[in-house]
């Protein structure tokens, strides 16, 4: 198992490097073929390589990704290493160890009939070319297990995830010479400053959950009393954050245009819809200015109800395997589990590696946890297929 992990970590797979992704897909496909006994279907969409294995009529979907956030060449500065039971390297936690655990778990089953495995190559950038594949597979499945890393260093699984929305607010003004006749212009930069404050005000209003929105933010509960928590900087609250701001063309011109990027995170679909209404209700503050508000993408939330039954089953199995009480937590980040849950497929996320530091220089995996996590997944799949 450790040798397999090393082979994947050494094969870099930056999301933006399609050639590297093709090499990674070949490595992951070879590993899966060796352990599952059959080669995957290679699906290339807009240059991005995804892998799919289908055994019989699928009832259980396993989801992972082979791309990472690490630019090609990162391995030189952050080489593969194992010291004192800790494995390090680019993407080791997010999520190459999860892929290794998944393949070994499936290899231990008596039969793979009813299993579908989908490993995409663009999760880290929002799954733009693979989302349809994931949702199509999820619609026909009784359960989806997502091999993202555990929710904490103790191996908690992820029972809820915030949804995300990205907006671009474009401010249209009118250009003029800043020295000769500035009064003839409509300053888009000044209007944008007003809008940034208005957007921040929406964020402050919704940060308390129900607050002034009338939409409960949630508490991070999973529907399984006593075993759940929230993490990730208020995983049960909505956030609205202006993130990027640009305006103008030259230093001596009244800006005719400005742009504001807005990041939205929500625990429920109702909150997502309500914040959409609030943002689309923004109005210009300066005469002559005009606003254009666009939702440019995102993912729906994975709400607690999507995972409740699977979490209860996983908890029972963990106890039977002597792995102690299994915790479920709600987290602020998104994954492809958001998409499987959104189409009505019961989903349990965070079944991958135990460690910490995803996307960070200190990313690591606890090697000793890999076999127990693989056993937990194997039993989950077996019982779900019954």
For every predicted segment, state its role.
Residues 61, 87, 94, 142-146, ...:
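Short glycine-aspartate micro-motif
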Residues 95-162, 208, 212-214, 223-233, ...:
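Acidic/histidine-rich catalytic neighborhood of metal-dependent amide-processing enzymes
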């Amino acid at each position: 198992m450790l040798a397999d992990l090393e082979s994947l970590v050494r094969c870099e797979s930056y999301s933006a490097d399609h050639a590297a992704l093709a090499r990674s897909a070949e490595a992951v496909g070879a590993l899966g073929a060796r352990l599952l006994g059959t080669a995957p279907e290679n699906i290339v969409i807009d240059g991005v390589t995804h892998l799919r294995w289908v055994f019989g009529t699928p009832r259980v979907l396993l989801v992972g990704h082979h791309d990472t956030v690490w630019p090609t060449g990162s391995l030189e500065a952050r080489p593969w290493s194992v010291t004192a039971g800790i494995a390090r390297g680019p993407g080791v936690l997010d999520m190459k160890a999860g892929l290794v655990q998944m393949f070994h778990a499936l290899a231990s089953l008596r039969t793979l009939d009813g299993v579908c495995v989908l490993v995409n190559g663009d999760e880290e950038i929002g799954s733009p070319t693979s989302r349809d594949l994931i949702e199509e597979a999820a619609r026909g499945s009784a359960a989806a297990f997502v091999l993202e890393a555990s929710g904490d260093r103790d191996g908690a699984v992820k029972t809820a995830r915030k949804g995300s929305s990205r907006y671009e607010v474009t401010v249209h003004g009118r250009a003029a010479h800043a020295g000769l006749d500035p009064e003839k212009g409509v300053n888009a930069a000044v209007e944008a400053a007003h809008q940034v404050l208005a957007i921040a005000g929406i964020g402050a209003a919704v940060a308390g959950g129900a607050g002034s929105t009338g939409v409960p933010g949630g508490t991070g509960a999973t529907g399984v009393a006593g075993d759940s928590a929230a993490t990730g900087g208020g995983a049960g609250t909505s956030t609205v954050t202006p993130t990027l701001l640009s305006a103008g063309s030259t230093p001596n011109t009244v800006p005719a245009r400005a742009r504001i990027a807005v990041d939205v995170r929500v625990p429920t679909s109702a909150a997502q819809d309500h914040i959409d209404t609030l943002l689309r209700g923004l109005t210009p503050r300066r005469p002559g200015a005009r606003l254009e508000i666009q939702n440019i993408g995102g993912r729906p939330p994975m709400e607690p109800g999507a995972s409740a039954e699977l979490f209860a089953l996983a908890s029972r199995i963990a106890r039977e395997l002597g792995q102690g009480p299994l915790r479920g937590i709600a987290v602020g980040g998104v994954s492809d589990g958001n998409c499987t849950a959104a189409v009505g497929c019961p989903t349990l996320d965070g079944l991958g590696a135990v460690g910490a530091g995803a996307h960070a220089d200190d990313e690591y995996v606890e090697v000793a946890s890999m076999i127990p996590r693989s056993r937990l997944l194997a039993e989950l799949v077996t019982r779900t297929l019954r």
